[in-house]
């Protein structure tokens, strides 16, 4: 939005050309989203408390969580507002990737918002049925996959790449649609499952999003992409503004979500953030890197799958409780210890993911 204005003004004063630089707009995206979160956050929390939009807590979970009942939820709306405003202000709005990523994020946020609303309306922690939620996630996921497939402007956009092996490139053809659906919906649910402790999901999301900003910037630059042996995807570089906005909004939200949390993001935030990471991985052609950097999300999801399968087949549980973070809580780990250790693991995994840029 502002980019068009600055392009017009640069005809009268060349100093406005500085806003053409992606790095500057990314920094401004971070700061804008961060400021919005700081300014709007307190008022939103007060309003959520006023209307009694509070968290519904499972009675079969760790007993320490019972004190969280009534804490304002749906704070993820703050993240979405900050990301949307910042992205629209500083991105090149003629870029198709910007619109795809932003719309996927907002649509998954809408699904999560409806889920949160139903939990509040009926006074329990169930919300939408798993089948209904999965159906609408799949609708958006498949629609996005089909859109990306039929608007692809180069073969690289539908090719599967394997990190560490620069010569391994598999042209997916129509299978790209299935992979894209799986990555977006899978990432969305993985982040949602991880969002069970104060700040547990948002910090890894910020770290992974920041790393994808690096991948987007390098993949959108022909010289850098060729030097590093990564896919060159024209136009994807402008997503560094979106990832910057996501980092800024996430840090701003963490200010209020850090232990002990003043607000929870709810499904409106968790489903949206996971979908955002998924679609970022798809358009930068770094699906495997998402699995590496988002290892915490992957393990949390696998713990749930393993728990369910084991119980159905043998009647026994592998973990004291799933997702995995609850297992450690029931082992006696204080909540802050679980959170920070999962953060540390994510930092390490993100560094490993970034290292794949050079190890090819």
UniProtKB/Swiss-Prot annotation:
Cofactor list: Mg(2+)
Family annotation (PROSITE patterns): MRAY_1, MRAY_2
Membrane topology of the entry: Multi-pass membrane protein
EC number per UniProt: 2.7.8.13
One annotated GO molecular function: phospho-N-acetylmuramoyl-pentapeptide-transferase activity
Catalytically driven reaction(s): UDP-N-acetyl-alpha-D-muramoyl-L-alanyl-gamma-D-glutamyl-meso-2,6-diaminopimeloyl-D-alanyl-D-alanine + di-trans,octa-cis-undecaprenyl phosphate = di-trans,octa-cis-undecaprenyl diphospho-N-acetyl-alpha-D-muramoyl-L-alanyl-D-glutamyl-meso-2,6-diaminopimeloyl-D-alanyl-D-alanine + UMP
One GO cellular component term noted in the UniProt record for this chain: plasma membrane
Keyword Magnesium (UniProt): yes
Gene Ontology annotations of biological process type: cell division; cell wall organization; peptidoglycan biosynthetic process; regulation of cell shape
InterPro entries in alphabetical order: Glycosyl_transferase_4, PNAcMuramoyl-5peptid_Trfase, PNAcMuramoyl-5peptid_Trfase_CS
Keywords, comma-separated and alphabetical: Cell cycle, Cell division, Cell inner membrane, Cell membrane, Cell shape, Cell wall biogenesis/degradation, Magnesium, Membrane, Metal-binding, Peptidoglycan synthesis, Transferase, Transmembrane, Transmembrane helix
Pathway(s) where this gene product acts: Cell wall biogenesis; peptidoglycan biosynthesis
Keyword Chloroplast appears in the UniProt entry: no
Subcellular location: Cell inner membrane
Positions of transmembrane segments: 26-46, 70-90, 97-117, 134-154, 168-188, 199-219, 236-256, 263-283, 288-308, 338-358
Primary localization class, coarse: membrane
Cited function: Catalyzes the initial step of the lipid cycle reactions in the biosynthesis of the cell wall peptidoglycan: transfers peptidoglycan precursor phospho-MurNAc-pentapeptide from UDP-MurNAc-pentapeptide onto the lipid carrier undecaprenyl phosphate, yielding undecaprenyl-pyrophosphoryl-MurNAc-pentapeptide, known as lipid I.
Family membership noted in the UniProt record: Belongs to the glycosyltransferase 4 family. MraY subfamily.
NCBIfam families named among the record's database cross-references: mraY (TIGR00445)
Protein name: Phospho-N-acetylmuramoyl-pentapeptide-transferase
